Regions:
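Hydrophobic core of alpha-helical transmembrane segments in multi-pass integral membrane proteins
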Residues: 28-34, 81-91, 122-128, 281-296
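Functionally important transmembrane alpha-helices
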Residues: 35, 207-266
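Juxtamembrane helix-loop-helix connectors linking adjacent transmembrane helices
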Residues: 42-75, 96-166, 173-178
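Small-polar-interrupted transmembrane alpha-helices in polytopic inner-membrane proteins
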Residues: 125-128, 157-161, 182-198, 212
Length: 301
């Protein structure tokens, strides 16, 4: 056992328990997520049979009405979130023997981190969209304003970002840091984050590489602050503004405020996977990673 400083707190590094706890948590994670997503699907089916929404799980990705698709997907994602939070509460209480808030939920002094995360996601997608327009990779078609769909998507991505960040950064990375140095911990947790998206539609090696890099990007602040609000805000903003600017998100085609035509699917524009499946996204993430590392390193000092 050795000791290290994170911020102003002294933490114990256990070379065995941390990494083992992190890796073994993957199995119950998939069990809980599958079980609770099943509840979400069941509720959506009930609403479908009662004619409240048009939902048939066998044709889930073929739902013609975008509103119904978003309602069903939002329901499923919030059940997913409940499952993740319940699992982590159990693990923190009975395995880690720590308060649940130690995952990184303290809001004290973190408003600026939330603003920074939301702003960076917007800037990343706005600049990426503009560059692709100027390069002739995509062609603007028009706007498709629908406030209810925008609200549903924002709520949906809140659930997605909290669930994924709380598990991957709040639990997996937190435990890995008890066993390994920050670089190794970031690499392992980011590989897990990337592989969680392995079965997404239209995924390819460029997309998985970018998701790995994004995992490091999202984890840098946690290494220095042990707080989740910046990665949650950046993850939320990244997903939300990606679809607002017309891109698919992690291979999923959904409602977009801006509509454009992809001239030709390639690794410059990301094709059917979305902007995060592009070389441009990788470049932006690497640049942002460097500046965030400098920023939070200075913050920690």
């Amino acid at each position: 056992i050795s000791y290290r400083l994170v911020g102003s707190e002294m933490c114990i590094r256990d070379s065995h328990k941390g990494w083992l706890t992190a890796i073994l948590s993957i199995i119950p994670f998939f069990i809980f997520v599958s079980f609770f997503q099943g509840f979400g699907v069941g509720l959506s089916n009930v609403l479908g049979k009662r004619g409240i929404i048009d939902f048939d799980f066998d044709k889930y990705l073929e739902i013609e009405d975008m509103r119904d698709f978003l309602v069903a997907d939002t329901i499923i994602q919030y059940f997913d979130l409940i499952g993740v939070l319940l699992l982590l509460w159990i693990l923190m209480r009975f395995v880690d023997k720590e308060p649940f808030i130690n995952l990184g939920f303290s809001l004290k002094g973190k408003v600026n981190d939330i603003i920074l995360g939301m702003t960076l996601g917007l800037l990343l997608m706005a600049v990426g969209y503009t560059i692709l327009i100027l390069l002739g990779e995509i062609k603007f078609i028009g706007f498709n304003y629908d406030l209810k769909n925008i609200i549903l998507l924002f709520l949906l991505f809140i659930a997605v970002s909290i669930a994924e960040e709380t598990y991957v950064r709040g639990y997996v990375l937190k435990n890995l840091l008890q066993s390994f140095n920050p670089i190794i911990s970031l690499i392992i947790s980011s590989a897990i984050f990337s592989l969680l998206h392995f079965f997404n539609p239209n995924v390819n090696y460029i997309a998985l590489t970018e998701l790995f890099i994004a995992g490091i990007l999202l984890g840098i602040s946690y290494v220095y602050t042990k707080n989740l609000w910046f990665p949650i805000a950046l993850h939320l903003s990244w997903n939300f503004f990606q679809v607002m600017f017309g891109f698919n998100v992690s291979g999923m085609d959904t409602y977009s405020l801006i509509e454009f035509e992809i001239i030709e699917n390639n690794n410059i524009n990301g094709g059917d996977f979305g902007f995060e499946g592009s070389y441009l996204s990788i470049l932006f993430s690497l640049i942002m990673m460097y500046f965030l590392w400098k920023y939070y390193k200075k913050f920690a000092e």
